[in-house]
Amino acid sequence: MRLLISNDDGVFALGIQTLANRLVQAGHEVTVVCPDRERSATGHGLTLHKPIRAERIEGLFDPAVQVWACSGTPSDCVKLALGTLLPELPDFVLSGINHGPNLGTDVLYSGTVSAAMEGVIEGIPSIALSLASFTARDFEPAAEIAVELLERLPHPSSPKVLLSVNIPPVPKEEIAGIRLTRQGVRRYVDLFDQRVDPRGKPYFWLAGEVVEESEPQEPADSHWCDVDAIRRNYVTVTPLQYDLTHYNSLSQLDHLSR
């Protein structure tokens, strides 16, 4: 299959290099268009007030992988690839492998998930892949999961669904299995470290700690939430969509229409 891969960690990240190289080994035609630097937590931002630059990169990936480094955001990269750089549209857009989890409400901030969602917006089935650790360096099990999912998914897949996949940071033999999950809750205690620059003006660094939470599971609910499943060393597969409408409220708030 023809695959487009992007990320938010940048072209030098081990996660995207491992993923692209493994997919080429599996027989896929792979093009990488990703940021030229770290772009984590940029959400679905686009570059509108300055030019976007893209240049071919050689020597970082398997020679069979075509690689572009882009000055824009992850969403810019996918939009530019689909609109200009690729001669043919891909069968799938993949994003990752992210250096860190994208669980629960993380997906609202994630450049990794947003890059994949851009593919869905353009009508192409997409997968976001995240290794659930900021320090782990072995991306091979996660890359193997990507190969397996592409083999098992129907082709063509639904173009309106993004699969957000989180892989536990354990050896392959310790992965408990693959679970279809719903989105959980993952909140943070935000802290702002205030400092003063050499000119005497204050500036701030956003820091903080994650508060691991998950919504209570209903007895009849067979689908775990992603936060719970990853704790138990399951690969989590969470279907997401760009339609954020709260449909139950349409009838409850119908009296507002006039």
UniProtKB/Swiss-Prot annotation:
Q: What is its main location?
A: cytoplasm
Arranged from A to Z, the UniProt key words for this protein are:
Cytoplasm, Hydrolase, Metal-binding, Nucleotide-binding
Q: Give the matching InterPro entries.
A: SurE, SurE-like_Pase/nucleotidase, SurE-like_sf
EC number(s) per UniProt? Answer: 3.1.3.5
Instruction: Relay the cofactor remark from the entry.
Output: Binds 1 divalent metal cation per subunit.
Indicate yes or no for the key word Nucleotide-binding: yes
Domain of life, source organism: Bacteria
Q: Does the keyword Acetylation apply?
A: no
Q: What does the record give as cofactor?
A: a divalent metal cation
Recorded catalytic reaction(s): these are: a ribonucleoside 5'-phosphate + H2O = a ribonucleoside + phosphate
Q: Name one GO molecular function term.
A: nucleotide binding
Q: GO CC terms on record?
A: cytoplasm
The entry's localization annotation reads:
Cytoplasm
Q: Which residues are recorded as binding a divalent metal cation?
A: 8-9, 40, 98
Which EC main class describes this enzyme? hydrolase
Q: Which PANTHER family match?
A: 5'-NUCLEOTIDASE SURE, 5'_3'-NUCLEOTIDASE SURE
Tell me the function of this protein.
Nucleotidase that shows phosphatase activity on nucleoside 5'-monophosphates.
- Give the family, as the similarity comment puts it: Belongs to the SurE nucleotidase family.
Q: What is this protein called?
A: 5'-nucleotidase SurE
UniProt organism field: Synechococcus elongatus (strain ATCC 33912 / PCC 7942 / FACHB-805)
